[in-house]
Amino acid sequence: MVNETSPSEYVNLRLVGDVVGPDFVEFLQDSQSWCSTALLVHSASMRLSAKGQAFTAELERFQLEVRDEEEWPGTRLFGHTRPVYRFRLDELSADYLSRSASSLLSLKPPDRLEDLCLLRPDGSAWLGSVTHERDAWLQLKNDEFSKLCEKAPSWFERFS
């Protein structure tokens, strides 16, 4: 996917702790101002529980595609692939995610898919995560950063 914005036009923020409860709900709601697609990944290293299978089945109503991929924001595999689920990000899907998981980093097997990424309409990553490593980050354009800072998200810190 082509990203026409140069890296200097971005502000990079790394997650400090986790985005939990009402903050997670608000975060998913706010993200819709900039993002239209989300993705989650099925980890081959851990089977999904019955709850995880139900989570994935329910996600199908928002699904755009499922494709075996070797790369997504934050991860590059060598010699193998994982199923990557892309789904539309809207009020209903954001509500489903926030009801299904108590926090950003709780999106992981065995009860859920993992590595939530939120993508702008041009396909560039706004949020990336590697949940089993408890790592998440935002790559914001300057105007997005200004608007998001109005809410003062204390769960992220700047990095270069």
Predicted features by range, described:
Residues M1-S160:
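Structured alpha/beta or helical-core interaction and ligand-binding surfaces enriched in interleaved
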